[in-house]
Amino acid sequence: MSMGAQEPRNILLLCRNCGIPLEDLRLCCIFCTKQLTAAELAAFALRELYLVWRAGVPYGACARCLLLQGIVRRLKYWDYSYYVEGVEEETKQSIYTQLIRCYMCHKPLVREEKDRHRNERRRLHKISGYWRGSCEYCWSRCTVRIPQ
């Protein structure tokens, strides 16, 4: 499926360039090599994640490996954390113009999620040289209370 010098960066471009409907696309995980399910392909596309190309073959990442990589990256490559104002001061840019992904599921944060970090004084984390935060789903998943 090699596309040569014009290798598409994401699943939707790959489907368009190859003339393949998303439901017919078959990709393997770059980490564990298992075939991605239809739900994993859709989630990969919605999260705007980039394909990895090896020897002219595109790879994605399954849900389990994405979560595992998020945890590993956070533990191994965390640099420091700042409140929104500190991030804006360091980067000389508004957080609204920056691509900030969730450190767990890797989805790009939308304006409301960035606002929540600002309004609730939650820190953003510099991990592997990139700013990361929590999306709405992972935020609620990490703060759920266990009944006693």
From Swiss-Prot:
Pfam families: E6 (PF00518). Transmembrane segments: none annotated. Keywords: Activator, DNA-binding, Early protein, Host cytoplasm, Host nucleus, Host-virus interaction, Inhibition of host innate immune response by virus, Metal-binding, Modulation of host cell apoptosis by virus, Transcription, Transcription regulation, Viral immunoevasion, Zinc, Zinc-finger. One of its GO terms (cellular component) is host cell cytoplasm. GO terms for biological process: DNA-templated transcription; regulation of DNA-templated transcription; symbiont-mediated perturbation of host apoptosis; symbiont-mediated perturbation of host ubiquitin-like protein modification; symbiont-mediated suppression of host innate immune response; symbiont-mediated suppression of host type I interferon-mediated signaling pathway. It comes from the Viruses. Its main location: host cell. It is found in: Host cytoplasm; Host nucleus. SUPFAM superfamilies: E6 C-terminal domain-like. The keyword Ribosomal protein does not apply. Signal peptide: none annotated. InterPro entries: E6, E6_sf. A zinc finger (unnamed) spans 29-65, 102-138. One of its GO terms (molecular function) is DNA binding. Belongs to the papillomaviridae E6 protein family. Forms homodimers. Interacts with ubiquitin-protein ligase UBE3A/E6-AP; this interaction stimulates UBE3A ubiquitin activity. Interacts with host TP53 and EP300; this interaction inhibits TP53 activity. Belongs to the low risk human alphapapillomavirus family. The cancer-causing human papillomavirus E6 protein has a unique carboxy terminal PDZ domain containing substrate but low risk E6s do not possess this domain. Plays a major role in the induction and maintenance of cellular transformation. E6 associates with host UBE3A/E6-AP ubiquitin-protein ligase and modulates its activity. Sequesters tumor suppressor TP53 in the host cytoplasm and modulates its activity by interacting with host EP300 that results in the reduction of TP53 acetylation and activation. In turn, apoptosis induced by DNA damage is inhibited. E6 also protects host keratinocytes from apoptosis by mediating the degradation of host BAK1. May also inhibit host immune response. This is Protein E6.
